[in-house]
């Protein structure tokens, strides 16, 4: 690795990670500091060349130095962890019951960050027992295979009359977000983290009548990388089973 003469965030030999976002810096979202939703956003390995090459150049403002002692394996997982850090901060989860729909890597990390941010209780759901076992290994005690038991029934047993107040859609399928909308408490928030291959058909009447809020979550910003590194370094978020 080589660094330009003006670079101060790292030096040759340092272990680093970097955000893959390429942003314009000139559009309104960028000017507001919301460059994760840049009007001209490109992502390396998608709309721009990736990093599977011997040498490539990145701007220093995308670089985050890894702390001493953090393995490169964990360093490679900071990117998805930052997705979890960002999504879990899109609404206030402290003291609230939470359901995370989808127990893949991102859903697992969203659930872990919700716990870290003070959620009262977190239930994670999926159709895969393997993914749910991984969630339990990561410290998410309450899991549900929705092919074996309905969410409504399980949530009632787990949360009682209090219900749950925050849902995270991390599966990317219509049945998932519809289930959240139909079982969450009125006046609650649903954060959409997944990328849907097909737009779901949702009841706007139900949304309005129950005064639900659908909140988008797009990738991350620099501070989310820093939060992810901090929580992983302190053992608050467990990457080892992943």
Task: Indicate residue ranges for each PLM-predicted region.
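Glycine-rich beta-strand-centered segment in the early N-terminal region that forms part
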Residues: 1-28, 67-69
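N-terminal Rossmann-like NAD(P) cofactor-binding module of classical short-chain dehydrogenase/reductase
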Residues: 17, 165-168
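NAD(P)H dinucleotide-binding glycine-rich loop of Rossmann-like/cofactor-binding domains
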Residues: 24-101
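Mid-domain Rossmann-like dinucleotide-binding core that forms the NAD(H)/NADP(H) cofactor-binding site
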Residues: 70-149, 153
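C-terminal substrate-binding/catalytic core of Rossmann-like NAD(P)-dependent dehydrogenases/reductases
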Residues: 153-161, 197-242
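Helix-to-beta-strand junctions that scaffold the AdoMet/dcAdoMet cofactor pocket
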Residues: 184-185
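Glycine-centered, small-residue-biased loops immediately flanking beta-strands
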Residues: 188-189
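Acidic carboxylate diad motif detector
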Residues: 193-194
């Amino acid at each position: 690795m080589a660094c330009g003469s003006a670079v101060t965030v790292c030096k040759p030999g340092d272990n680093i990670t970097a955000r893959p976002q390429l942003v314009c810096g000139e559009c309104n979202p960028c000017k507001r500091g919301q460059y994760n939703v840049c009007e001209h956003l490109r992502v390396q390995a998608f709309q721009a060349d990736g990093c599977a090459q011997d040498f490539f150049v990145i701007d220093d403002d995308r670089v985050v130095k890894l702390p001493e002692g953090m393995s490169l394996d964990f360093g490679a997982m900071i990117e998805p962890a930052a997705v979890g850090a960002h999504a879990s901060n899109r609404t206030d989860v402290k003291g609230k019951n939470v359901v995370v729909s989808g127990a893949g890597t991102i859903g697992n990390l969203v659930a872990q960050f919700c716990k870290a941010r003070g959620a009262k209780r977190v239930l994670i759901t999926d159709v895969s027992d393997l993914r749910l076992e991984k969630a339990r290994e990561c410290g998410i005690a309450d899991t549900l295979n929705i092919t074996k038991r309905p969410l409504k029934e399980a949530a009632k047993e787990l949360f009682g009359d209090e219900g749950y107040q925050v849902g995270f859609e991390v599966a990317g399928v219509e049945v998932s977000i519809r289930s959240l909308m139909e079982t969450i408490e009125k006046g609650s928030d649903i954060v959409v983290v997944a990328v849907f291959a097909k737009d779901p058909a949702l009841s706007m009447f139900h949304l309005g009548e129950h005064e639900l809020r659908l909140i988008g979550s797009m990738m991350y910003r620099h501070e989310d990388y820093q939060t992810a590194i901090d929580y992983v370094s302190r053992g608050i978020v467990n990457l080892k089973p992943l």
